[in-house]
């Protein structure tokens, strides 16, 4: 089936307070974010038309703008309302929502002191990120040569557009070698994350996940930790070295887009989709379809 370009679709996109026809939601060529990566975004999922963890994502977008020294005139409630409106007007059941704040075209050059921060929200049907086969058999990862940077080198806890450059390079490298995605190490050589998801492994029935000190502490990551604790599964947030992957019984990835996706291969190491992964995944899938008051 041919891919439908994202700039040529039916529907509507919320842009700076107005709901525009999808194809008319455009920015100028000299937009600062296009040249310098000065943007912050979020990714949310809705299930049966209900957005999961909406407040948390809206607050994180505001905090990301603060980290990027971007003065945004919208509140978290404004962002949440725009997301809800985008889902409603596009009649989305199970789908994905992408809010994006970016610096505009008022000023060109590295400095952006005079540039206005814009906000847009798109929503579209998107049932699965990795696909049904990956869900059953696990995705295949290749360790990337690109490293996650130190907190001294970049605002690593912001979901900033510019930080995804190395993720794109890593994913292309993996796909060209026949893998699904990359496993990225950090600047110290420790296991960090995938290009757009957090990493968990199971050892002796307990969960281990890298300490989120140089990458995004994902909202789904924190949700999975809560699920595990409620199930009585011990969780270790710690430094994980690549050689430890040989002793992992199960591995899985978590993220808003990825949800809970098992990992079947890392380089030349293979893993089964085991009972802990299935339990966590099943609990998460039940939670995302609960009313907001019960899923909190």
Predicted regions and their residues:
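Helix-start/capping segments and mature chain N-termini
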Residues: 1-85, 89, 110-296
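Short, internal active-site loops enriched in acidic
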Residues: 102-107
């Amino acid at each position: 089936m041919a891919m439908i370009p994202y700039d040529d679709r039916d529907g509507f996109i919320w842009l700076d307070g107005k709901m525009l026809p999808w194809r008319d939601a455009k920015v100028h060529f000299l937009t600062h974010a296009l040249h310098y990566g000065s943007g912050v975004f979020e990714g949310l999922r809705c299930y049966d038309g209900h957005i999961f963890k909406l407040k948390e994502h809206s607050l994180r977008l505001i905090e990301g703008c603060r980290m990027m020294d971007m003065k945004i005139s919208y509140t978290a409630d404004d962002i949440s309302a725009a997301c809800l409106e985008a889902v409603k007007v596009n009649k989305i059941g199970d789908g994905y929502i992408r809010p994006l704040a970016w610096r505009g075209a008022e000023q060109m050059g590295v400095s952006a002191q005079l540039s206005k921060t814009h906000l847009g929200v798109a929503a579209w049907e998107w049932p699965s990120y990795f696909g049904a086969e990956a869900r059953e058999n696990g995705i295949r990862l290749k360790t990337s040569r690109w490293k996650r940077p130190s907190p001294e080198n970049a605002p690593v806890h912001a979901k900033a557009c510019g930080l995804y450059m190395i993720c794109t390079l890593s994913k292309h490298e993996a796909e060209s070698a026949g893998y699904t995605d990359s496993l990225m190490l950090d600047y110290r050589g420790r296991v960090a994350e995938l290009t757009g998801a957090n990493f968990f492994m199971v050892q002796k029935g307990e969960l281990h996940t890298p300490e989120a000190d140089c990458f995004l502490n994902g909202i789904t990551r924190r949700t999975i930790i809560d699920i595990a604790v409620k199930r009585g599964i011990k969780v270790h947030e710690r430094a994980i070295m690549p050689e430890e992957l040989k002793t992992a019984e199960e591995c899985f990835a978590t993220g808003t887009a990825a949800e809970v996706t098992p990992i079947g291969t890392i380089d030349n190491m293979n893993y089964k989709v085991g009972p802990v992964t299935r339990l966590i995944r099943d609990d998460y899938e039940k939670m995302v379809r609960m009313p907001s008051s019960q899923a909190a």
